[in-house]
């Protein structure tokens, strides 16, 4: 009998916030520890966005006490893009603003100004995150996993919305090229949250990939 476990990592959803900021290896260790504690010997892994990023790194772990048969990556993060000129300028402006507003006199006079500036520059996730999770997000988004993709040695299904702006379809094409035994399913006119926009179709594709069920 198959069992499905939905695992929410530290700092995500309603889970507890970590005491310190985490990096990709911390999340991988968290997953491995959980699987071992549950005494799971074989499993399939499904990850969306950062969940996919964690799976990519986990699949490159030297020694696992369990067997991963297949993986599904949905709009997976993990490929770092070169920053555009406008993005570089924004980062530069933010660093200058941060330096200026670190002066005590200005901090006392404008206590919330730096926070407002941060909110102008960050992504939606960054804006809504706590300070610890903001540090975590910075670590994660700057971790490029391209070099790990060719070492994934299990059948891999990639599911992507063609209109994904967070992890563009070009990322999916790159992963399909780099992961040896992989296939890409493009879902037309869907965003980063393709599994919410086309849940029945996505579920059917995953079931067929994992079990050969076409229902």
Write out the residue ranges for each language-model feature.
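Catalytic histidine-centered segment of alpha/beta-hydrolase-like enzymes
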Residues: 190-203
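Conserved alpha/beta-hydrolase "acid-adjacent" motif
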Residues: 165-171
């Amino acid at each position: 009998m198959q069992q499905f476990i939905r695992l929410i990592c530290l700092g995500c959803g309603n889970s507890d916030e970590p005491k310190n900021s985490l990096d990709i290896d911390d999340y991988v260790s968290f997953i491995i520890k959980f699987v071992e504690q549950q005494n799971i010997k074989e499993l399939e892994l499904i990850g969306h966005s950062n969940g996919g990023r964690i799976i990519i790194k986990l699949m490159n772990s030297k020694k696992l006490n369990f067997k991963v048969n297949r993986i599904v990556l949905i709009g997976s993060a993990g490929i770092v893009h070169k920053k555009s000129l406008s993005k570089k300028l924004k980062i530069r402006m933010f660093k200058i603003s941060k330096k200026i507003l670190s002066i005590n006199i200005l901090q006392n006079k404008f206590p919330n100004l730096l926070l407002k500036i941060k909110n102008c520059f960050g992504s939606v996730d960054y804006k809504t995150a706590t300070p610890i999770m903001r540090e975590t997000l910075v670590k994660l988004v700057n971790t490029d996993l391209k070099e790990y993709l060719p070492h994934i040695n299990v059948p891999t299904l990639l599911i992507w919305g063609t209109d994904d702006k967070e992890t563009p379809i070009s990322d999916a094409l790159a992963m399909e090229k780099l992961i040896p035994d992989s296939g890409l399913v493009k879902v037309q006119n869907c965003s980063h949250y393709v599994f919410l926009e086309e849940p029945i179709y996505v579920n059917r594709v995953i079931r067929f990939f994992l079990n050969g069920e076409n229902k």
